[in-house]
Swiss-Prot record:
GO terms for molecular function: adenylosuccinate synthase activity; GTP binding; magnesium ion binding. Belongs to the adenylosuccinate synthetase family. Plays an important role in the de novo pathway of purine nucleotide biosynthesis. Catalyzes the first committed step in the biosynthesis of AMP from IMP. It comes from Mycobacterium ulcerans (strain Agy99). The keyword Transport does not apply. InterPro entries: Adenylosuccin_syn_GTP-bd, Adenylosuccin_syn_Lys_AS, Adenylosuccinate_synth_dom1, Adenylosuccinate_synth_dom2, Adenylosuccinate_synth_dom3, Adenylosuccinate_synthetase, P-loop_NTPase. The active site is at 13 (proton acceptor), 41 (proton donor). Its EC number is 6.3.4.4. Pathway: Purine metabolism; AMP biosynthesis via de novo pathway; AMP from IMP: step 1/2. Its main location: cytoplasm. This is Adenylosuccinate synthetase.
Amino acid sequence: MPAIVLIGAQWGDEGKGKATDLLGGRVQWVVRYQGGNNAGHTVVLPSGENFALHLIPSGVLTPGVTNVIGNGVVIDPGVLLSELKGLEDRGVDTAKLLISADAHLLMPYHVAIDKVTERYMGSKKIGTTGRGIGPCYQDKVARMGIRVADVLDTDQLAHKVEAALEFKNQVLVKIYNRKALDPDQVVESLLEQAEGFRHRIADARLLLNNALEAGGTVLLEGSQGTLLDVDHGTYPYVTSSNPTAGGAAVGSGIGPTRIRTVLGILKAYTTRVGSGPFPTELFYESGEYLSKTGGEFGVTTGRRRRCGWFDAVIARYATRVNGITDYFLTKLDVLSSLETVPVCVGYEIDGKRTSEMPMTQSDLCRAKPVYEELPGWWEDISAAREFDDLPAKARDYVLRLEEISGAPVSCIGVGPGRDQTIVRRDILQERA
C-alpha cells in the first residue's frame, strides 16, 4: 500500500487529530513528520475521553499501530516524557512508539533564546509559542543542532553541547543580559531524560520503507497548516518547518513516489492563532459565535483563536501547493442555526478583484474578502452519519465548498467524537 499524507489546509487547528484517529484502525504506521510541541491535536474517543497530544502521533490511541516521531520533528525531551507519562497513567499502551535517530532535540538554550527574543522584539514580535521551536530549527540548518542519536554517544554529545553554548551563552549574556548555561549541567540533565526514551530510538527511514515494501499502510501526519509553512505560508507569520505535503517525504525519509493520497483537513470556517494577515477575520458577534460554539482555543497555547468565514482563496491555494486529492471538512455542525453563511470566493485589492492568493504580504494585508452568501440551516446535524442525513442546505454548502476548493470533500465532521463523521468516499481505497 502507498503512503498517505494528512495536512492542515488553513492556519492549523483544522481537526487533524480527528482524521488521524478515524483512519488509525486501518493503517499500520502513523508518522509525525515536522514541528514540535508548538502544536497540538485533540482526539475525542467514543467513550468521551479527551486526549490532547503535542509531540506523539494521534495513532498512539489506536491499539496495534506503530507510531513514529520522524526526523523532521524537533523534540523537547521533557515534554516527550511528560506526554508519555500522561498517556500511560490513563492506560494507553505506548510500547509501539519509536523515535527517529535523526530528529533534533530541543535544548534549554533554545527555549531561553526564544522567550527573550520575543520580549526584545516588543510590538514587532511574530507571536511564537515561546517553546524554542524556531531556534532549534535554526541550529539544525546551521549544522550545530543536537540529534536524538547523540544521546547514544556521551563524548560526542558533550562536545556538541559545549560548542553550541560557546556561542549561545554569548548571545544570552552580552545581548540579552541573561545568565549563561553550564554545559555540564545541560548534558547531565539530557542524559537523565534520555533514559526514558533511549529504547525507542530507531532507524525510522529503514523501518518505514520496509513496511511499505511489505504492503503496509503508512499515514504521515503533519502539524499546523499550509498557511504556516515556512516557504508557502504567510511569511514571516509562519512556523519554522514545512507542514505542507512536500515536507512529509523529507521529514519521514519516505520517497515522494510512495505517496498516492494527500488528505487536506479543512474547517468549515477559518481560524488562526497569533499575528499575521487574515482577510475573513470576524469581530464582534459573528466572531464571538464561532469562537464560543466551536470551542476555539489553542490546544497548546490556550490562546483564543481568531475566527472568520470560510476562505476559498486559501483553500484553492492549499489544494495546489499540496496536491490535495481529498478533503476532510470538519466542524460543519458549528454553523448550524445561522440564517446565512458567507463564503469568501475572492479578494478585492486596491479596487481590483482576484481569486488567487496574493504574491506579496502587503497585498494580502490589504485584501478585502468578496463574499457569496449561502443559505444556512437550523437543524442539529451532530447525529448525521450519511450525507443524505444532512439538511438540504447543509449539503448544498458542502457541495459549494467542494466546487470552489478544487478537490472532493470525502469526509465530513459533524461533532468532536470519533463516530461523528460522514464518509462520502473511502480515501484508503486504491484508485486507478
